[in-house]
């Protein structure tokens, strides 16, 4: 039986509005999820201009309401969270363990989403800013711990991206020195990943003093207030070196500012690793001398997430009191177009860490 639900749908030209959406029954390998919370991410803002009408949202948690044939790992009424980098499990990347780089990208066919406004596609195969989402089974991870839906929802992008960039991609070791540039939700997740890895020094860098207060609460050992006029954060890099006595072993760029894409390279010591976490995609000039002396620069996608290993691990860390998620949700807004406008405004202003839409 088809489900009618309300969704926030973009027009592909920068606008979005509430609309009614009809979802078909789950087919083989599909799950119908009632959305209880949807995180708000910078990528959601970017997606408004992608030239097609989208059911917005790619961070979500809720309750499985119906499952299709062949779905065995979740059942109706299970609490679940959604994963946007959906692995097929069979392509060469998935077989190598690089599931976030899946080449097949399982999707529910777009004709299963019917809207009076015309053809729509679920963002990243999910479309979590809606009352319900119809998704491939590989997108669904069961929640087996006691956690608010809002806290679970943010695991599915920002938290996993930051934490995984530290633990999976960089493989930060105990005793290392780490710099995190930008202390929004992703940067705070890098801080938590570094704390989990038992880094000796975790230096948080931001131009917003309020975010440095958050970074300290999340595990940063040092906080450095940068100047907005510090081009390339070169002065901040010198301050980092003064704190450590040398460059850092690792530096993570979480600002989403194109001009700062190369900034982590200026922070690391010879042989150090700079990690691009925020997903800067613009063409930017880079001083190639920053790569000298075995410095490396990596750009991992989604913290190299293996959803059925990593997301349960993060849930277990939360349940053990070792991962702050409730504290990261600094504001909630109604799951509606007006609520999303307010959430985007809060995000642009730099208020708090993570905004979440709730029904």
Predicted features by range, described:
Residues 1-3, 262-265, 308-359:
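C-terminal hydrophobic helical "lid"/dimerization subdomain
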Residues 20, 88-181:
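NAD(P)H dinucleotide-binding glycine-rich loop of Rossmann-like/cofactor-binding domains
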Residues 22-38, 48-95, 100, 142-147:
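Glycine-rich beta-strand-centered segment in the early N-terminal region that forms part
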Residues 59-61, 78-79, 93, 132, ...:
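Residue-level marker of beta-strand positions
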Residues 74-75, 172, 268:
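Short, well-ordered loop/turn sites that connect or cap secondary structure elements
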Residues 80, 138-139, 144-229:
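Mid-domain Rossmann-like dinucleotide-binding core that forms the NAD(H)/NADP(H) cofactor-binding site
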Residues 258-323, 359:
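Glycine-rich phosphate-binding loop and adjacent beta-alpha segment
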